[in-house]
């Protein structure tokens, strides 16, 4: 008699979350909500015309072979702030690569602020991430992505591994911004180079696309002066890049910059928990 061997294939986390909003009576209201697998979306109460969405990976982190898909649709005249419940942790991958794909669409006069908390990459983590954004001609968009190469306070560092990050931002179908980052192999040696991170282990990119780019530049430059980084503005677009010695030092610079790019509004409350 032949007995089938039990599968030893490890379980993989899968999640898919979709949120769509519409404007109604001057407020941003929920139009569609879908969540599947490890993806959850929570909507804390707000007291203005915006909506706050907190996306959650109930798996508690990602490793090789896991995949999360997020979709955000902001209808005309809406405002959505999207953040994460906690820092996303990317653990050592025994095989394959974790994937995170985020799609954002903003209609006429809408604004979307994509404000996830930091992503922490542990040693031998493997992550491929993609952000695709489609903006109406009159929409505004703010994106913040911060990366920690390990947890310095815990004596942890990402020495080997893979991190790929791809952004494609389009306005009315035209490509207006592209990012392509790849850290592969000996990450510690690569990031030690002066032309890369000069040994810093925490870094971030902020992008604002909209009519206030020039105004924001004047507010942001004094905040980043004296730190490792800089800010540039052109064609209704502002890009800020920062690096710091650890996550705490990065946050001290990052949070005031985010607030400036949000007309003085604070970061989402979950950032303070």
Swiss-Prot record:
InterPro entries: UreD. It is found in: Cytoplasm. One of its GO terms (cellular component) is cytoplasm. GO terms for molecular function: nickel cation binding. Pfam families: UreD. Keywords: Chaperone, Cytoplasm, Nickel insertion. It comes from the Bacteria. Belongs to the UreD family. Required for maturation of urease via the functional incorporation of the urease nickel metallocenter. UreD, UreF and UreG form a complex that acts as a GTP-hydrolysis-dependent molecular chaperone, activating the urease apoprotein by helping to assemble the nickel containing metallocenter of UreC. The UreE protein probably delivers the nickel. This is Urease accessory protein UreD. It comes from Rhizobium rhizogenes (strain K84 / ATCC BAA-868) (Agrobacterium radiobacter).
